[in-house]
C-alpha cells in the first residue's frame, strides 16, 4: 500500500496507473499529416472505426519488415489504415483492400488519390471479406491485416494464414475488445470469437505471435 488514508493505493492500482500512462504516451506520440487527418475526419463522419495513429505507425513498421510488396486488408474503412500500410510498402507494392460498403471504398480511393498513390498500387474489392479471401492465391502476401467484425475473426485468421508467404505477417485488430477478451466473466459471441482466433494463432506451430496493447489490441504473428 502506498500513501496514507484516503490517498492510499495498492501496488496493483499503481501498476495499472503506470500502464495507463504508458498507453496514453504511446497513443499520443504519433502525428499524422493533412491527408491522413482528412481521411480520419471522413471516417468519423461515416461512423467507420479507424485505427489510431499509434496502431497505424506499427502497421507501417510491420509492413516494411515484411517486405511490403503484396498486402491484403479486410476492413477498408475510409482509407486510414490503408494509407499507413502503403507508407510501409515498397514503391511497387500493391495493397488489396476489401470492404462490403461501397461508400467506404469510394472514400478510401479518394484518400489514396489525395496521397498521390497511383491506381496500379491499390486493388479495392467490394464484398464480404470471407468470400473475397477464399479467392486470393495461397502464399502470395507479405502481410494480411484484419480489421473487421470480431465475430468473423476465426474465419479470417484461417484464410489469412493461408495467404502468407514465408516470413509473412498476419495482424488482427480488435484483439482486446476494450479489455473484454481478457475478462473471464465475459462470454458473449464477440469475445468467444476473438478468443478462438487467438487460439488458432497460438496453436499454429508455423506462427510466432505477440499481443500488442495498442488501439483495441493488435495480435500479430509471423509465419516461419
Curated annotation (Swiss-Prot):
InterPro entries per the UniProt record, alphabetical: Cation-dep_OMT (IPR050362), SAM-dependent_MTases_sf (IPR029063), SAM_O-MeTrfase (IPR002935)
Domain of life: Bacteria
SUPFAM superfamilies: S-adenosyl-L-methionine-dependent methyltransferases
Gene Ontology biological process terms, A to Z: methylation
EC number per UniProt: 2.1.1.-
Binding site for substrate: 147
Entry keywords, A to Z: Methyltransferase, S-adenosyl-L-methionine, Transferase
Name of the protein: Putative O-methyltransferase ML1075
Annotated positions binding S-adenosyl-L-methionine: 51, 73, 75-76, 81, 99-100, 149
Molecular function GO terms recorded: O-methyltransferase activity; S-adenosylmethionine-dependent methyltransferase activity
Gene3D superfamilies named among the record's database cross-references: Vaccinia Virus protein VP39 (3.40.50.150)
Keyword presence, Transferase: yes
Family: Belongs to the class I-like SAM-binding methyltransferase superfamily. Cation-dependent O-methyltransferase family.
Amino acid at each position: 500500500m502506498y500513501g496514507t488514508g484516503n490517498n492510499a493505493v495498492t501496488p496493483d492500482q499503481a501498476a495499472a496507473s503506470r500502464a495507463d500512462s504508458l498507453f496514453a504516451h504511446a497513443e499520443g506520440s504519433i502525428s499524422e499529416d493533412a491527408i491522413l487527418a482528412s481521411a480520419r475526419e471522413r471516417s468519423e463522419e461515416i461512423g467507420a472505426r479507424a485505427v489510431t495513429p499509434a496502431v497505424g505507425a506499427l502497421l507501417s513498421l510491420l509492413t516494411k519488415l515484411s517486405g511490403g510488396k503484396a498486402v491484403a486488408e479486410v476492413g477498408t474503412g475510409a482509407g486510414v489504415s490503408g494509407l499507413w500500410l502503403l507508407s510501409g510498402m515498397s514503391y511497387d507494392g500493391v495493397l488489396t483492400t476489401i470492404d462490403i460498403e461501397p461508400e467506404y471504398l469510394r472514400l478510401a480511393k479518394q484518400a489514396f488519390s489525395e496521397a498521390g498513390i497511383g491506381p496500379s498500387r491499390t486493388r479495392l474489392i467490394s464484398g464480404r471479406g470471407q468470400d473475397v479471401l477464399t479467392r486470393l492465391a495461397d502464399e502470395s502476401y507479405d502481410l494480411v491485416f484484419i480489421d473487421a467484425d470480431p465475430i468473423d475473426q476465426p474465419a479470417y485468421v484461417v484464410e489469412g494464414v493461408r495467404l502468407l508467404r514465408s516470413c509473412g505477417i498476419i495482424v488482427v485488430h480488435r484483439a482486446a475488445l476494450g479489455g473484454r477478451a481478457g475478462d473471464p466473466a465475459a462470454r458473449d459471441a464477440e469475445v468467444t470469437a476473438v478468443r478462438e482466433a487467438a487460439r488458432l494463432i497460438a496453436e499454429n506451430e508455423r506462427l510466432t505471435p505477440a499481443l500488442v496493447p495498442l488501439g483495441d489490441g493488435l495480435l500479430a504473428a509471423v509465419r516461419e
